[in-house]
């Protein structure tokens, strides 16, 4: 028998097409039993709250030779399992003794075939964080033609993350890169808006710096969420609306004004296709537009 004091489990990329009638939600209800003689079994852990791409670590103090997994839910899914050595220097070497699915498409050996990839002290550089457990999962499913777990939001932002996964592989850097780029692109767009409003470079730079230093901007742009994409396109739509509203009624050619409004509308639609919050921004655009038309009409009547 071997001593171990932690059980590491993780659910990563899998085949969600294998059971489309049930959501695969990680270690939903898996019991672990242990024995030293294959006769008497003791339940040592119950895995109930594991999320996709995140480690679930059960702490304890055990000394057993055999481990048995009993799955009580068709929603459960598990990609890899490891048993931390008592001295915390690595994981115990393990092998499969009995497997009812040995000749099936998902043998038990798949649970221990990537022991070298398990992380002793996982951080958010190694696993999903916050809503990444939803968006990254959907992106991976899109990138690989899998049955989708959820479609709460429009899928443009998720498809952008999926494209990055296809290009650079399934890893935290890959799924976080598009949002970081979108966060950077917000700065020149905001600078352009402020330049239209204040006509001053210094104030525009100060406003852009405040956005760059904003905690919420940094937080959402460094993880794989949909906010950076939606907000980037919202800012673009407002830039063109400001461009239209701040132009002179007498000097702005009608064709040019139509182009401004068209670009604003296009970016508005793109923002909504990234996340439903773009709809709220659309209300603001409508208020700006109709207010401007009323002002122009009153100016014309004079």
Language-model features: where?
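Transmembrane-embedded, aromatic-rich helix segments that form part
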Residues: 262-263, 277-295
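Membrane-interface transmembrane helices that cradle and orient dolichyl/undecaprenyl
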Residues: 198, 237-260, 271, 293-300
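Short acidic/glycine- and proline-prone juxtamembrane loop motifs at membrane-interface regions
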Residues: 175, 179, 216-229, 277
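Aromatic, loop-rich ligand-recognition surfaces of beta-strand-rich domains
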Residues: 1-124
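Extracytoplasmic catalytic/substrate-binding loops of multi-pass membrane glycan-assembly enzymes
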Residues: 101-136, 148-160, 170-173
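Transmembrane-helix motifs of polytopic, lipid-linked glycan transferases
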Residues: 173, 177-198, 236-240
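Transmembrane-helix signature of polytopic, membrane-embedded enzymes
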Residues: 190-213, 232, 249-256
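Juxtamembrane segments of multi-pass membrane glycosylation machinery
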Residues: 143-149, 160-181, 200, 215-216
């Amino acid at each position: 028998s071997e001593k171990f004091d932690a059980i590491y489990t993780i659910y990563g990329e899998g085949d969600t097409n294998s059971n489309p009638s049930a959501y695969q939600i990680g270690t939903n209800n898996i019991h672990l039993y242990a024995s030293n003689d294959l006769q008497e079994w003791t339940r040592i852990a119950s895995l109930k709250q594991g999320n996709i791409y995140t480690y679930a670590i059960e702490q304890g103090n055990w000394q057993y030779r055999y481990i048995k997994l009993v799955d009580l839910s068709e929603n459960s899914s598990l990609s890899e399992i490891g048993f931390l050595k008592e001295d915390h220097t690595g994981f115990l070497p393990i092998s499969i003794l009995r497997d009812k699915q040995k000749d099936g498409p998902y043998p038990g050996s798949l649970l221990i075939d990537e022991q070298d990839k398990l992380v002793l002290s996982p951080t958010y550089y190694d696993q999903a964080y916050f809503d990444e457990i939803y968006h990254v999962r959907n992106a991976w499913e899109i990138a690989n033609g899998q049955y989708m777990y959820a479609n709460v939001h429009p899928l443009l932002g998720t498809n952008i993350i999926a494209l990055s996964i296809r290009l650079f592989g399934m890893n935290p850097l890959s799924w976080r890169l598009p949002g970081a780029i979108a966060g950077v692109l917000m700065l020149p767009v905001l600078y352009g808006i402020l330049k239209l409003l204040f006509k001053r470079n210094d104030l525009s730079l100060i406003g852009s710096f405040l956005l760059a230093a904003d905690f919420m901007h940094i937080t959402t742009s460094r993880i794989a969420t949909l906010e950076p994409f939606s907000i980037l396109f919202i800012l673009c739509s407002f830039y063109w609306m400001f461009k239209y509203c701040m132009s002179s009624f007498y000097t702005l050619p009608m064709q040019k004004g139509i182009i401004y409004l068209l670009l604003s509308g296009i970016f508005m639609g793109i923002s909504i296709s990234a996340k439903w919050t773009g709809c709220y921004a659309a209300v603001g655009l409508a208020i700006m537009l109709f207010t401007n038309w009323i002002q122009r009409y009153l100016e014309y009547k004079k």
